[in-house]
């Protein structure tokens, strides 16, 4: 079942903006800014689950760049068939992250158990936001005419 064209357009806009904002934030963190936290230690505790430190700047920048590429891939309609595959992969990945939660995700990534601050923020903000973004990405999947429909 395909979403209504307006729903698909809203999903593309929402997911494009959300992923672009997350990408820009990661690029900002890669420069050394702790915003919106007061310090890099507080930021590390809130977003990485460990006051011991943040991932290296190049890795954070790579995540930011990847989010910006995902934003472009989910928000545009240049090659619908390819972009629907991209949307399916990105949307499913985001929903899987939301379903697993930050605690399980950090374990799967081989990281130490996350702090109580991270677990609380994950439950209240990160998981719901990631779930909404995942649903928006999937809502952006648009109908692509089949060969039969083109012949008719």
What residue ranges belong to the model's regions?
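Short amphipathic, positively biased membrane-proximal segments
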Residues: 1-152
């Amino acid at each position: 079942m395909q979403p209504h064209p307006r729903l698909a357009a809203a999903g593309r806009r929402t997911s494009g903006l959300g992923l672009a904002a997350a990408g820009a934030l990661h690029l900002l963190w890669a420069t050394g800014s702790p915003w919106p936290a007061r310090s890099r230690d507080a930021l590390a505790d809130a977003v990485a689950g460990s006051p011991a430190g943040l991932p290296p700047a190049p890795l954070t920048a790579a995540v930011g760049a990847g989010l910006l590429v995902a934003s472009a891939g989910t928000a545009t309609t240049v090659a619908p068939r390819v972009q629907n595959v991209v949307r399916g992969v990105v949307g499913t990945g985001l929903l899987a992250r939301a379903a697993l939660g930050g605690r399980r995700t950090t374990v799967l990534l081989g990281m130490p158990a996350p702090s109580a601050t991270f677990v609380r923020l994950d439950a209240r903000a990160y998981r719901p936001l990631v779930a909404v973004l995942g649903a928006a990405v999937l809502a952006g999947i648009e109908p692509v005419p089949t060969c039969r429909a083109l012949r008719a």
